[in-house]
Amino acid sequence: MRRSLAPSQRLGVRIKSKDAFTPPLQKKNKRVCQIELQKRQSALRDATNTVELPLPIRFTANSDYEQAIAKVLARKFKVPIANYVPDYGGNRTLGVRRSIVRRALHDPQACNALVLYTPPAYTEHERMSLDPSKLQVHVVVDPILSNVLRPHQREGVRFMYECVEGKRGNFNGCIMADEMGLGKTLQCVTLTWTLLRQSPDCKPTISKAIVVSPSSLVKNWEKEFTKWLHGRMHCLAMEGGSKEDTTRTLEQFAMNTATRCGTPVLLISYETFRLYSHILCKTEVGMVICDEGHRLKNSDNLTYQALMGLKTKRRVLLSGTPIQNDLTEYFSLVNFVNPEMLGTGSDFKRNFENAILRGQNADSTDAERERALEKTQELVGLVNQCIIRRTNQILTKYLPVKFEMVVCAKLTAVQLQLYTNFLKSDQVRRSLADCTDKTTLTALADITTLKKLCNHPDLIYEKIAAREKGFENSQNVLPPNYKPKDVNPELSGKFMLLDFMLAAIRANSDDKVVLISNYTQTLDLFEQLARKRKYSYVRLDGTMTIKKRSKVVDRFNDPATDCFLFMLSSKAGGCGLNLIGANRLFMFDPDWNPANDEQAMARVWRDGQKKPCYIYRLVASGSIEEKILQRQTHKKSLSSSIIDNNDSAEKHFTRDDLKDLFRFEANVLSDTHNKLKCKRCFQDVQRQPPPENSDCTSHLSQWFHCSNNRGLPDSILSQAWMASKCVSFVFHHRSQGDAKQPTCITEDNHSEQPQLNSKRNANSVLENDDDEDFDPNSSDEKFLGF
């Protein structure tokens, strides 16, 4: 069939003009196309045989309608990346750099702008006489960060910037001592990003920075930089790898002297930094940040000396625990960030330490005490220029309520028999007879044995089976059906209470739980109990690799996973982990250092937590665990001072100290409550409530005291108290200081305790309380009298 021709082909008329362009003919065959192309080229050639290309096709609008369509089609170019946000200079066009007026990277007049530096105000006459290329500009925090910073975080960023830039004095270092959960990491990310991008001179202040942290937190720092900066900056995280690869990578980082590096921030652990310090100390670094900086309290260790050799004047030290009780440690931390502030070690002793310690002696004169007070005030006033500390009272504005409970659990009959037999043994008697270094070491081992026995007899079964000193005749104490590899909660008061509470939580709520212990052997028992009750769980201890830790934490925090328990070794993961997937935490055994326990217990009440939190500290009634708790309380009450010269509560024991530790207080509800000599309680029953301005950060004497399960803020604990019959006493309080709570009900004032019959009951809190901020200066802390 013959193909019909188009009208233009039938007419044979084509317009040939240099000013007009006609659409090509429909393709017939290759020969016809070549002929047509030659015709077009010949029509465009001039006398010099130069081709004049036609103008590009343009849309011609002949009516209002056509103009409207043209506006729609002529839309502005859009970057084809989802949720793309330009970092800076988004309105700039390509081309030759134009001479423009120097201006800040971000608008200082914008809403919610955080201005860290304001240049001097010049008159128009002064501005004309100055060199335009040297005019200073505002330093403004990137809006992507300033819009998410809370008021206390904005204050912290401003404080650190002024310190590292020397605006607050003749120094360039600072200590960020905020308590856990206040966002120290976000504040440091903001400071680092600002210094890498801005300065009053319209150029970066620094080109590189190093963040040194425990190995378990290196990955967390990388996630925080990515999270808050939305991937605008790449960090170099040193996680494992061979020695050759690590050396090559660090050498490339050290030798990179460009103003803008591809990876300007190095994330490295303390151990790796110490091993490769000879590489990193070759060149200058803009700033170093030391996370968990209390590791640097000893100026004689190799890590401290390696970091001191780093060529940088800007040093930031982060520590969520207060600087406590030792002037030498105090000097080491301050001297690291600002080496010249307190002089040399001998200068510090001569000017401050000797006078302060002399005034603390029991036989000191009034003049020596007065001079000690003067020197203390002088020292605090000097170092406060570079130290900022805020308590987690601030979090009460942003986080759900937190309930803290110290639960005294009675020893079982088996535990009590083993405990008393060991105290009466020749092993303990010899330890108390003399206080030489050798016997002190033996006493420390005996203390550890008693602490493990308070957890569960399984932890000392090997000593019992081997008939070691102190357990020669203890084999008969264990029940006939005893199996060491099959955990029996009924042999331990604390384990029995834990078993009942976990069952109640699992049956009546969707809460997740964190279990923390100082001993991996206790974690083994947790695992056996979880398998016995068919609870899903994850475990993190020192044997887990750094990469796997991050995956385990992410899995547990995922609401979609049915992971009920997170078992944590306080030595391996007590610092820096964010476990907001859980809202209940059990601290199964106390540590000598209260800072270690506080770090571990701060894993759940953090930014991102959506549910009320319950913190349980379990101690065995009348045992050595209560003695440790009392020493913790005494040490915490001294935390506002820097005067106590005790290095470690576990290393300097007098004979009287040891006798007190090895004394078992039988038939008491709580030895700690007895030593408080509480005037609000009569015969262990509370008659008066605590002060209205108290909260869970106050001294234990200002907490609620309960000798029965009535008046407890947690119905889970109340039910477990009745079911297990092993709880003797409870101290409890909440995070909001002015919250109205019921006093513990006496026998004469009965009220029915609500039973656990729904998931809503399990999280019973007063959600409508209008809590105000707590004033930390209004608390009147008291010392324990022991």
Curated annotation (Swiss-Prot):
Instruction: Name it.
Output: DNA repair and recombination protein RAD54-like
Q: Where is this region: Disordered?
A: 740-786
GO terms in the biological process aspect are: cell division; chromatin remodeling; DNA synthesis involved in double-strand break repair via homologous recombination; double-strand break repair via homologous recombination; double-strand break repair via synthesis-dependent strand annealing; meiotic DNA repair synthesis; oocyte fate determination; oogenesis
This entry carries the following GO cellular component terms, namely: nucleus
Sorted UniProt keywords: ATP-binding, Cell cycle, Cell division, DNA damage, DNA repair, DNA-binding, Helicase, Hydrolase, Meiosis, Mitosis, Nucleotide-binding, Nucleus, Phosphoprotein
Per UniProt, where does ATP bind?
A: D178, E179, M180, G181, L182, G183, K184, T185
Q: How does it assemble?
A: Interacts (via N-terminus) with spn-A/Rad51.
- Sites where Phosphothreonine occurs are at T22
Q: Where in the cell is it found?
A: Nucleus
What family is this?
A: Belongs to the SNF2/RAD54 helicase family.
Keyword Nucleotide-binding included in the entry's annotation: yes
Q: Which InterPro entries match?
A: Helicase_ATP-bd, Helicase_C-like, P-loop_NTPase, Rad54_N, SNF2-like_sf, SNF2/RAD54-like_C, SNF2_N, SNF2_RAD54_helicase_repair
Where does this protein come from, organism-wise? Drosophila virilis (Fruit fly)
Please explain the role this protein plays, according to its UniProt record. Involved in mitotic DNA repair and meiotic recombination. Functions in the recombinational DNA repair pathway. Essential for interhomolog gene conversion (GC), but may have a less important role in intersister GC than spn-A/Rad51. In the presence of DNA, spn-A/Rad51 enhances the ATPase activity of okr/Rad54.
Where does the record place Polar residues bias? 752-766
- Region (Required for chromatin remodeling, strand pairing activities and coupling of ATPase activity), start-end ranges: 2-9
Helicase ATP-binding domain: which residues? 165-340
**What Enzyme Commission number does this protein have?**
3.6.4.-
Primary localisation category:
nucleus
